[in-house]
Amino acid sequence: REVFFGRGTCFACHKAAGQGITLGPDLNGIRTRHDVNYVIRSILIPDEYIVEGFQQTSLAMKDGRKLFGMIQEETAEMVKIYLPTGEQVIIKAADILKRDDARNSGMPSSFTYTLNERDVADLAAWIMTLE
């Protein structure tokens, strides 16, 4: 908990224990979907597992705007994109000139440098307790 809400700054993108925001996947109940090794690898090598709905996408619009974020919902007529600011924008699919889906995670890959082994172990263990 200390790492999540402290120097790990995980709460800035993830929701857990009723706190944080949802720029990244909700971590509550992750133990029912994955084991602790998945959690550790996701912290240290975030590009290895990109959860569906959290892939970074860049949209070039016909009106010249560029939007970057995560596609939250999509139909043949519209796209709902979640911007890094937390804003959700709904646009007409016909207004998209070009779309680029990133092959990497939006999660920083710097945790191998900013967290020590104990921090990662404590963080992963705490995440696995979340209901």
Region roles according to the model:
Residues 19-44, 50, 56-101, 106:
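Gly/Gly-Pro-rich "capping" loops immediately C-terminal to redox-active cysteine motifs
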